[in-house]
């Protein structure tokens, strides 16, 4: 076996590039989870609706998204749908990275993917709330919608927080697939640094450390929030 000769001195000058890529990953993941959570909330309300067509649409969406690879979905949104005349334009006022067509499309594709998983997390949280709470709300004269948003959802937040945190952590890691379509995330910096320094292993180690720091920090934050919520429960 050959000796492993690591030289991080040439990598140090590229730290601003790594950090810039890390910021793109954070923005991409945060945007995805926020939009995905909104989509998930709509989907779970559709699943809980008494209107059968909404149930069918929501379940079909969830099954398709969860049953196909995320990379395939990204390619469909970025390359397939434009052939049918459906595409997203870049937003130049956001800059070359955040406003690029690839970045905007990546957020849409990943958010729609995340929404399917978040809907299941939310459904579990909503179903965990005692049904007596719904009956109490209706007894107070609240409509079904008012009961859901005023009583049920606030109580379910504490239950779903760990699941949403896990989804955020998962998205930080899985968002690395956007590097395959040219989005300048932290994983894409590997291509830049490797081509400029001719070092292969060192950039991967740095990127691995960045991912670990991001996910570990988020995990610690979620545990802190859980403790705070349990304190006031």
Predicted regions and their residues:
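Transmembrane alpha-helices and adjacent helix-loop boundaries
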Residues: 1-233
